[in-house]
Amino acid sequence: MWYLLGNFELIMDKELVVLVDQEDRQIGTMEKIEAHATAVLHRAFSVFIINTNQELLLQQRAFDKYHSPGLWTNTCCSHQRDGEKTLEAGSRRLIEEMGIKVPLTELFTFIYKASFDNGLTEHELDHVLIGYGGKDPKINLEEVAAFNWMPLDEIEKDLKQNPQDYTVWFAIIFDRFYNYIKNKKIL
């Protein structure tokens, strides 16, 4: 299926996402771009890699992405494939995007909805994952333009001062992530 985004961008997408209900029970699958075009609730995950200095590994999205190009976001995020376990999906994308292999742990899930300027909407039941490591990534330039290790408290401040530099979902997810790890005294 072909989709027209913005004024001129035409893309074809065959990647499927897992459609879920509010309780994360699978109710079907749909092409990713169609799910984003119609704002259907689907399963996703967000990975946060933290080093011993309590810095988060951020990625700058590649500049040719069909939404949120060039914006900073968490270490990686994507969608589980049909039948794929969440931690396996997180590990797969972490290797594909950042060239990193570390054990991941699921912290929590929540539902959010965020719209983009190009008419697409993320409506996701997001599984938030954490991993620990300090090595610089070997980024996949098709997915990632750059990376940066940034202290968590500085991210919190910068998100307020420069929200235009970050993906819309990162602001939502980071707030929940940071409050969770502070309340649970994880770091």
What are these regions (language model features)?
Residues L4-L10, E31-I33, G70, D82, ...:
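Nudix hydrolase/Nudix homology domain
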Residues I11-S46, T52:
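Acidic, metal-coordinating catalytic segment for phosphate/diphosphate chemistry
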Residues Q26, H36-A37, S68, C76, ...:
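Glycine-rich, flexible loop/turn motifs
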Residues E34-F45, E55-R92, E96:
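Conserved Nudix-box catalytic region and its N-terminal flanking loop in Nudix hydrolases
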Residues A39, N53, I95-P137:
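Active-site segment of metal-dependent pyrophosphate-handling enzymes
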